[in-house]
Amino acid sequence: TLSANAQSLSSKDNAAIDAKVDQFLKLMEKKDYTKVLDFMYPPIFEHTSKKDMFQIFEMLEQSGIELKFKNTEVLNKQGLKTIKDTKYALIKYRFELDLPLNTDELRGYAPLLVPVLQSNFGKENVTYNKSQNLINAKGEKFLMAINDPKYSDWLFLIYDSSMRTAIEKTIPAEVNNQA
């Protein structure tokens, strides 16, 4: 249920956000983190570095784990306040992440990886299938979409607790409180 405070998004904004989210999630599935960064709202980088943004995924990839994103799906979108001609919206999406542990070395990482993923996705959303050597994580995450007149299109912030400090420094408090 949307709060009475939620702004409805115009059909034009809705379509624009859908198209951008679709591109964003496809790039995530391809693990093209460099291009994903182009979809980020630039002021966030005054408060966090680009390399920190996907650190966990890159760390896993460097250790030899072939991440597989799948079943990405937008669950809902909610318009937030418009402040100084900048529009904001909150997008909830779902995805799954498979981490095949194809070598003995990678299987040895499982006791370390599972707790890290559980702290990121919630204990109930991470399964380790030893017989298939596969860790699966299901997640529901949030993006904040921002349409700032300084930029030509909707851009995103990864809206989660790991980014809290940077978000608080980037987004007006009344928008943040509403989200």
Name these PLM-found stretches.
Residues 81-179:
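Exposed beta-sheet edge and beta->alpha loop/turn motif
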Residues 28, 57-61, 145:
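Hydrophobic, Leu/Ile/Phe/Ala-enriched alpha-helical segments that form helix-helix packing faces
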Residues 6-26, 30:
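Short, low-complexity N-terminal intrinsically disordered segments enriched in polar/charged residues
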Residues 1-5:
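C-terminal segment of classical bacterial N-terminal signal peptides
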Residues 10, 46-49, 160, 164:
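Intrinsic-disorder-associated interaction segments
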Residues 22, 54-58, 168, 172, ...:
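Generic detector of well-ordered alpha-helical segments enriched in charged/polar residues
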Residues 6-11, 42-43, 121-122:
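Short charge-dense sequence patches
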Residues 18, 34-88, 93, 101:
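Short solvent-exposed beta->alpha transition segments
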